[in-house]
């Protein structure tokens, strides 16, 4: 039986470029805090080991399973919590921007490789080629990463929803210009619009957690990550993280996972009833 009311820890983690030991230690502390506060799942950022587009990805990326993922698995087991987070994955001669979902026994139950990789990041990461979902005590969970949720790549979210996802977890590294201040809206409709479309059409919850800190090295050097992570359902924003440039923090989201009866071709009929006709796009 699935648990409909789920407590998600949104771990806005301070991530330093090329410093996996320090970053993973912070992830450990975040897992400990999330467990203490009663979270069922802890969601961590994209590329939490090395930072997104950091040049160290070429030489320091590790396989999955491997030393970095093993540490996250141990944290999940030690603190009896599900953990989803992004890692830089080495596989043969390729590097991927990957994410894993780990159960509370420390087992990897889903691995995903980012598909909608920005052009500037393609010198570091190869393109992923598959999507999957997994059944958990908290409903069916799908995983994607950051720009997979751009409005022009929403097919990725649609596919996860059609595969049954009731909850989409999206490790992210949302970057903004260094000059942006706390008084400004960092993202506008960039993320809220696609999240609202998906959650409204499928009655699912989508949650993205971004890192905080300044990017050092790579094509985005000098930009910063400022938090403001979001959890969104069909009614709008459930909770939003605080603006933060230098210090990580844990945000708690209480969500309701809604059963969905429509499957297969019935989903198309459901979407049509809601005024969404994919053939008109």
Which functions belong to the PLM regions below?
Residues 64, 90-172, 176-193, 245, ...:
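Active-site catalytic loop in hydrolytic enzyme cores
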């Amino acid at each position: 039986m699935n648990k409909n009311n789920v407590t998600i820890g949104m771990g806005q983690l301070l991530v330093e470029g090329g410093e996996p030991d320090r970053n993973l230690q912070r992830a450990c502390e975040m897992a400990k805090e999330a467990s203490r506060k009663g979270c069922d799942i802890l969601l961590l950022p994209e590329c939490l080991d090395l930072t997104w587009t950091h040049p160290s990805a070429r030489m320091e990326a590790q396989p999955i399973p491997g030393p970095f993922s093993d540490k996250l698995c141990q944290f999940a087991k030690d603190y009896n919590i599900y953990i989803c987070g992004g890692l830089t994955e080495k596989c043969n001669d390729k590097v991927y921007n990957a994410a894993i979902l780990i159960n509370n026994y420390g087992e990897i139950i889903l691995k995903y490789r980012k598909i909608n990789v920005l052009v500037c990041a393609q010198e570091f990461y190869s393109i992923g080629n598959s999507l999957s979902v997994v059944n958990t005590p908290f409903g069916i969970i799908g995983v994607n990463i950051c720009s997979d949720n751009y409005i022009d790549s929403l097919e990725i979210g649609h596919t996860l929803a059609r595969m049954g996802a009731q909850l989409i977890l999206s490790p992210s590294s949302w970057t903004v210009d260094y000059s942006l201040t706390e008084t400004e809206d960092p993202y506008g409709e960039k993320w809220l619009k696609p999240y609202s479309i998906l959650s409204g059409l499928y009655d699912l919850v989508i949650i993205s957690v971004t890192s905080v800190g300044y990017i050092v090295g790579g094509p985005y050097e000098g930009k910063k990550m400022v938090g403001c992570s979001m959890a969104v359902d069909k009614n709008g924003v459930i909770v939003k993280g605080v603006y933060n440039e230098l210090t990580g923090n844990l945000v708690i989201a209480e969500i309701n996972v809604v059963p969905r009866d429509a499957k297969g071709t019935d989903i198309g009929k459901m979407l049509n009833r809601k005024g969404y006709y994919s053939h008109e796009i």
